[in-house]
Amino acid sequence: MREETPEQPAPLRSGYTTGSCATATSLAAARLLLTGVASDVAEIVLPKGQHVPMPLVFCRLIDNGNDNDNSSDAGAEAGTIKDAGDDPDVTHGAVVFARVRLVAAPGVTFRAGPGVGTVTRAGLTLAVGEPAINPVPRKMMTDHLAELAAEQAYGGGFEVTIGVEGGEALALKTMNPRLGILGGLSILGTTGIVRPFSCSAYIASIHQGIDVARANGYTHLAACTGNASEDAMRAHYGLPDIALIEMGDFVGAVLKHMKRAPVERLSICGGFGKLSKLAAGHLDLHSRNSSIDLEQLAQWAAEYGADTALQAAIRAANTSQQAVALARAQQVPLGDIVCRHALAVARAIVPPQVNVEMFATDRQGNLIGAAQ
């Protein structure tokens, strides 16, 4: 028999970033090379000072087969299973691993292993050609390896290769290809901890998408809630993928980022229901944080001539799409009305030099409202 759902759900469990996994595995592999001790657990210190033991699934010596006289042919590798807690992270359950070699020159050199991408476009925090290992994870690894070197009186350096098993396929489910990060995933994290449903990585990718487009000379961007609205903007303006920002429910992340990274023209396009939430002042369009206000839609329709019968029908509608269809049948442009209110909300946030416009679509991606 199926168990009852508890009235009070258990607290959501936090997890650890790929940056934390990379730090633990690189530390364990380096320690094996310097001490001969293979670890089952690697304890790391997160940026805010928390000490975290990370279990390892392997820690072993390997033969790199390298002929460089300035480095050791022998290396070591260690791996851990990425635990994202209760966050719906694409990398949850993947094996993140590090391969480490000792080199003569002090410091740490980073390389992209299997499943980790390489930066191919300007506009990110990393230079073109660099492995997609973000600055905080790089610092975490560098700090831990420097401390280990001091403990062991080791004066050389480390070559660290980070990989993710299956990462090339997983990366296709992320924004990396559009950002110009090719061949795999990014090694991410600023605190070392994944907060369930914080969506910080998604919001960061939205900001990166805007930054990359600007750095590559694009002055007109379209931020879209999903595939249908994105297809509508691609067809309407002929914009390339790099200029199409997949914002999902996070329209606020796009609008607020315009203060730091403005563009000449910003087109916001989304399903009618999503845009009706923005029109009501909501900047997070997810159903758990905002809802469609049919009463408000009826009031707006009334301002443009809807009779009492139509107002009542809109209030009683099963969906926002039904509401807009009822209005259109009586020549009340509810799609345009919602776009005008959404545009007013957006203009109150973005700098005046950003020319914003709104587009609403139906479920098939047809444009059913606009405001400029």
UniProtKB/Swiss-Prot annotation:
GO process terms (BP): anaerobic cobalamin biosynthetic process; methylation
PANTHER family: COBALT-PRECORRIN-5B C(1)-METHYLTRANSFERASE (PTHR35863:SF1)
Lineage, top ranks: Bacteria, Pseudomonadati, Pseudomonadota, Betaproteobacteria, Burkholderiales
Annotated protein name in UniProt: Cobalt-precorrin-5B C(1)-methyltransferase
Residues forming coiled coils: none
EC annotation from Swiss-Prot or TrEMBL: 2.1.1.195
Gene Ontology molecular function, alphabetical: cobalt-precorrin-5B C1-methyltransferase activity
Pathway assigned in UniProt: Cofactor biosynthesis; adenosylcobalamin biosynthesis; cob(II)yrinate a,c-diamide from sirohydrochlorin (anaerobic route): step 6/10
Reaction catalysed by this enzyme: Co-precorrin-5B + S-adenosyl-L-methionine = Co-precorrin-6A + S-adenosyl-L-homocysteine
Class of this enzyme: transferase
Alphabetized UniProt keyword annotations: Cobalamin biosynthesis, Methyltransferase, S-adenosyl-L-methionine, Transferase
Record InterPro entries: CbiD (IPR002748), CbiD_sf (IPR036074)
HAMAP family: CbiD (MF_00787)
UniProt similarity note: Belongs to the CbiD family.
